[in-house]
């Protein structure tokens, strides 16, 4: 929603291609019927056709598709089935990379997913004003583990505690990882979110929003380190304010 609002504020006309049971109803309602198409996850042919009908010069991937859709609830059309069959490995990078190739084959430029969100990126240093209750040694350990997980295409985050890895993010997503980490019921745990060294910023850019913050609170985690300028904070000011009220420290690192 922030992308659409910020683009419109800049005088850029915006159209929506949303996904049934995935795209927020309030976002869909921002667009009249003539300026939106709602399709099922996996209907790549319909998506490409909609981009052509809208005469799009640029496209931007925003939001998230529930990870389980890859295994259950996927409705691949012929185009999507062909792509999935051609992939030796099926992860976010390979799947979205293949979709990006199809989009750009239409002469459409796929934008950096951080476009129109300059003021929503993680900032360097403390974002909540709290002193960060994790030593540099253990912070650097968490950053190293998160970056290695990202490099190996496992995921973009991890939870560590004093040099011990409690959980790593895999295909189930951040919230499920945080729930698993919370099962240890220990203090001084640190959640780290990063990007790949060779991140393709057209898709799968890590995000941190109120839902993630709520998952941290439920799991009893009080510290999060986010790569500055890379991780998107969805509704940044609200997230920071809520983090302060819950006593959760947010730190941006580079």
Question: What are these model-derived regions, one by one?
Answer:
Residues 12-15:
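Residues at the starts of beta-strands that form the adenosine-phosphate
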Residues 1, 7-9, 38, 89-93, ...:
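Conserved mixed alpha/beta catalytic, RNA-binding, or beta-rich assembly cores of soluble enzyme
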Residues 18-21, 41, 62-65, 106, ...:
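Fold-independent oxyanion-binding glycine-rich loops
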Residues 61-73, 104-112, 156-166, 200-206, ...:
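Short secondary-structure transition/capping segments
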Residues 2, 17-56, 73-83, 91, ...:
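Feature captures the catalytic cores and cofactor-binding loops of soluble hydro-lyases/lyases
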Residues 44-114:
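N-terminal glycine-rich phosphate/adenylate-binding segment common to multiple enzyme folds
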């Amino acid at each position: 929603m922030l992308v659409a609002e910020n683009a419109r504020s800049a005088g850029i006309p915006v159209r929506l291609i949303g996904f049934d049971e995935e795209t927020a109803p309030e976002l869909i309602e921002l667009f009249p019927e003539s300026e939106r198409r709602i399709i099922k996850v996996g209907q790549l042919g319909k998506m490409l056709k909609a981009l052509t009908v809208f005469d799009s010069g640029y496209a931007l991937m925003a939001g998230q598709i529930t990870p389980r859709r890859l295994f259950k609830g996927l409705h691949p059309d012929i185009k999507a089935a062909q792509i999935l069959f051609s992939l030796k490995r099926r992860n976010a990078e390979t799947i979205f990379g293949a979709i990006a190739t199809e989009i750009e084959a239409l002469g459409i430029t796929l934008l950096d997913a951080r476009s129109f969100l300059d003021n929503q990126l993680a900032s360097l240093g403390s974002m909540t004003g709290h002193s960060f209750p994790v030593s540099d040694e253990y912070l650097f350990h968490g950053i190293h583990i998160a970056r290695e997980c990202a490099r190996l295409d496992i995921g973009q985050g991890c939870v560590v505690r004093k040099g011990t890895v409690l959980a790593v993010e895999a295909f189930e997503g951040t919230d499920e990882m945080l729930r698993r980490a919370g099962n240890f019921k220990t203090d001084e745990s640190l959640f780290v979110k990063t990007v790949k060294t060779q991140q393709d910023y057209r898709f799968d850019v890590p995000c941190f929003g109120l839902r993630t913050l709520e998952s941290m609170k439920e799991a009893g985690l009080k510290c999060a380190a986010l790569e500055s300028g890379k991780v998107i904070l969805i509704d940044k000011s609200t997230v920071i304010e809520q983090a302060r009220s819950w006593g959760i420290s947010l730190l941006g690192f580079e």
